[in-house]
Swiss-Prot record:
Its EC number is 1.5.3.16. Optimum pH is 7.5-8.5. Binds 1 FAD per subunit. This is Probable polyamine oxidase 4. It catalyses: spermine + O2 + H2O = 3-aminopropanal + spermidine + H2O2; spermidine + O2 + H2O = 3-aminopropanal + putrescine + H2O2. GO terms for biological process: polyamine catabolic process; spermidine catabolic process; spermine catabolic process. Belongs to the flavin monoamine oxidase family. Pfam families: Amino_oxidase (PF01593). GO terms for molecular function: polyamine oxidase activity; spermine oxidase activity. Flavoenzyme involved in polyamine back-conversion. Catalyzes the oxidation of the secondary amino group of polyamines, such as spermine and spermidine. Substrate preference is spermine > spermidine. No activity detected when putrescine or N(1)-acetylspermine are used as substrates. Plays an important role in the regulation of polyamine intracellular concentration.
C-alpha cells in the first residue's frame, strides 16, 4: 500500500494576521493546543509567530511528552525519543540542532531501517556469555535481508495482507537454504528482535504490506549526545503552556467555537483546537467529544495500532563492558533476545540502556521498578558474570502511563488504505497532530514536528477562511521564516568519539 505524502499549502496569499485584527476590531484569533510534545509545541510556535493567541494544555508536570531527558544520573539520558533519524539538512530539526550547537553521535551511516541501523559497532553474546563471531552475525544479517526482500514477492502475490512473521514463514518454506540452524538461528531471532524494536510491536502484528513504506531521510541515524531537552525548550520558549491541565472534554459550539474542559472544572474557549495527544490516549477515549466525532474519524483512530517500547537505564561507577555501541544477547526466540545501548561510547558516561519492545515491554511493566532492574541485570550478567550492581537505575512505563498509553503508532495487518487521510482530516475546527498522523515519518521526532506544523497551517487556513480574509493573508510556517529555524553558518556537529 502506498502511503500518501503530507501536503503543505502553497500559493500563499499576502498580508498578516495583524492586519486582519485591525479590521476585525482587534479580535485576536485563538487556538488551544492539547499536548506539549514536540508536535504540539511546533503547532503552538507556528501559530504564535502568526500572531494567534495560543494556549497549550499539558496533563503532565513537564513539557516534551514522549521526549523526556532525565538528568538524575548527573548526565542527560533520553528515556523517550533519543535518535535523530536523518542526520542531514533534510531533517526539519537540523536547523535547531545546528543553531544550539548540539552534538550528534552517528550510530549508523546508512538510511536503512533494519539492515545496518546501529550495527556498525556491536557485540553479541549467547545466553552463556560466549561472544558470537562477527562473521556469523554478518552472514545471518545478509540472510535476514534476503528473507525480507523475498517477502516482497509474497506481498505482490496476494491481495490480502498478512503479518511479517507469516510472510517470513512462507519465504522459509519456499527457500529452505535461508533457514538457519543452531547459533545462526538464534542470531536470526536477534535480528527479528531488532525489527520488532523498530516498530515497538511483535512481528506477528506488523503489516507485511506496510512495514517498509516509511520514508527515510538521508544521513543515517544519530544519538542526541546532550539529549533532546534543549530542542524542546527552544521550541517552547515564551509560549503560554499550562502544566497539570488534563483535558477531559472538547465541545464544538453552535457559534463556531470550541470549549475545552480540564480536570478540576476549568474551561477554555477558543476558535479552534489542535489535538496532539498520543494515539493511545485517543484510542482509550480519555477525551470526550461533544458532539461525538463522526464514525469515519473514530474508525481511523481505532484502526491504527499503538506499540510499546520501554527503556531501563543503568548507571555504573565505571564502564566494564567492551567499547561498542550496542551489546546484544541472542536466544531461541525474539522475545528472549535483548540489547543494550552503550551511552559510554557516545557520551563518556558509564550508562547502559536496555531496550524492550512489544510483549516484553508490556510484561516488564507488570513488575516493580526494582524487579525490572533486577531482570535487566540478570540479562547483563549472562554476558558479564562479574558485573557489579548499578549505582542508579531508571525505568519507563510508556504503555501504562495514562499520558501516553503506548509508545508510537504502527500499521496493523489489513489496515484500510484510506485510514491515514481520515486520521489527519480535521472535524470542523478540531485539528489533529502528533507522530501518528504523519504518513511518511511515523514514530519519529521530526515526523511529529512536521505533523504539528501541518496541523497549525490547516488551522490557520480554516480561521482565515471563516473570517473571510483568506485571499488577503498568508500562512506562517516554521519551515520557512521562524527565528528558531534560522540558518546557522556552522554545520551539524557529528561525533564518532
Amino acid at each position: 500500500m502506498d502511503k500518501k505524502k503530507n501536503s503543505f499549502p502553497d500559493n500563499l496569499p499576502e498580508g498578516t494576521i495583524s492586519e486582519l485584527m485591525q479590521k476585525q476590531n482587534n479580535v485576536q484569533p485563538s487556538v488551544i493546543v492539547i499536548g506539549s510534545g514536540i508536535s504540539g509545541l511546533a503547532a503552538a510556535r507556528n501559530l504564535s509567530e502568526a500572531s494567534f493567541k495560543v494556549t497549550v494544555l499539558e496533563s503532565r508536570d513537564r513539557i516534551g511528552g514522549r521526549i523526556h531527558t532525565d538528568y538524575s544520573f548527573g548526565c542527560p539520558v533520553d528515556m523517550g525519543a533519543s535518535w535523530l533519524h536523518g542526520v542531514s539538512d533534510e531533517n526539519p530539526l537540523a536547523p535547531i540542532i545546528r543553531r544550539l550547537g548540539l552534538t550528534l553521535y552517528r550510530t549508523s551511516g546508512d538510511d536503512s531501517i533494519l539492515y545496518d541501523h546501529d550495527l556498525e559497532s556491536y557485540g553479541l553474546f549467547d545466553m552463556h556469555g560466549n561472544k558470537i563471531p562477527p562473521q556469523l552475525v554478518t552472514k545471518v544479517g545478509d540472510a535476514f535481508k534476503r528473507i525480507l526482500e523475498e517477502t516482497e514477492k509474497i506481498r505482490d502475490e496476494t491481495a490480502n495482507d498478512m503479518s511479517v512473521l507469516q510472510g517470513i514463514s512462507i519465504v522459509l518454506d519456499r527457500n529452505p537454504e535461508l533457514r538457519q540452524e543452531g547459533m545462526a538461528y538464534e542470531v536470526l531471532q536477534w535480528y527479528l528482535c531488532r525489527m520488532e524494536a523498530w516498530f515497538a510491536v511483535d512481528a506477528n502484528l506488523i503489516s507485511l504490506k506496510c512495514w517498509d513504506q516509511d520514508e527515510c531521510l538521508s544521513g543515517g541515524h544519530g544519538l542526541m549526545v546532550q539529549g533532546y531537552e534543549p530542542v524542546i525548550r527552544t521550541i517552547a520558549k515564551d509560549l503560554d503552556i499550562r502544566l497539570n491541565h488534563r483535558v477531559t472534554k472538547v465541545v464544538r459550539t453552535s457559534n463556531n467555537k470550541v470549549i475545552v474542559a480540564v480536570e478540576g472544572g476549568t474551561n477554555f474557549v477558543a476558535d479552534a483546537v489542535i489535538i496532539t495527544v498520543p494515539i493511545g490516549v485517543l484510542k482509550a477515549n480519555l477525551i470526550q467529544f461533544e458532539p461525538e466525532l463522526p464514525q469515519w474519524k473514530t474508525s481511523a483512530i481505532s484502526g491504527l495500532g499503538v506499540g510499546n517500547e520501554n527503556k531501563i537505564a543503568l548507571r555504573f561507577d565505571r564502564a566494564f563492558w567492551p567499547n561498542v555501541e550496542f551489546l546484544g544477547m541472542v536466544a531461541p526466540t525474539s522475545y528472549a533476545c535483548g540489547y543494550f545501548l552503550n551511552l559510554h561510547k557516545a557520551t563518556g558516561h558509564p550508562v547502559l540502556v536496555y531496550m524492550a519492545a512489544g510483549n516484553l515491554a508490556q510484561d516488564l511493566e507488570k513488575l516493580s521498578d526494582e524487579a525490572t532492574a533486577n531482570f535487566v541485570m540478570l540479562q547483563l550478567k549472562k554476558m558479564f558474570p562479574d558485573a557489579p550492581d548499578p549505582a542508579q537505575y531508571l525505568v519507563t512505563r510508556w504503555g501504562t502511563d495514562p499520558n501516553t498509553l503506548g509508545c508510537y503508532a504502527y500499521d496493523v495487518v489489513g489496515m484500510p488504505e484510506d485510514l491515514y487521510p481520515r486520521l489527519g482530516e480535521p472535524v470542523d475546527n478540531i485539528f489533529f497532530g502528533g507522530e501518528a498522523v504523519n504518513v511518511e515519518h511515523q514514530g519519529s521526532a521530526h515526523g511529529a514536528f512536521l505533523a504539528g506544523v501541518s496541523a497549525s497551517q490547516n488551522c490557520q487556513r480554516y480561521i482565515f477562511e471563516r473570517l473571510g480574509a483568506w485571499e488577503k493573508l498568508k500562512l506562517v510556517s516554521l519551515m520557512g521564516n521562524s527565528d528558531i529555524l534560522e540558518t546557522a553558518t556552522v554545520p551539524l556537529q557529528i561525533s564518532r568519539m
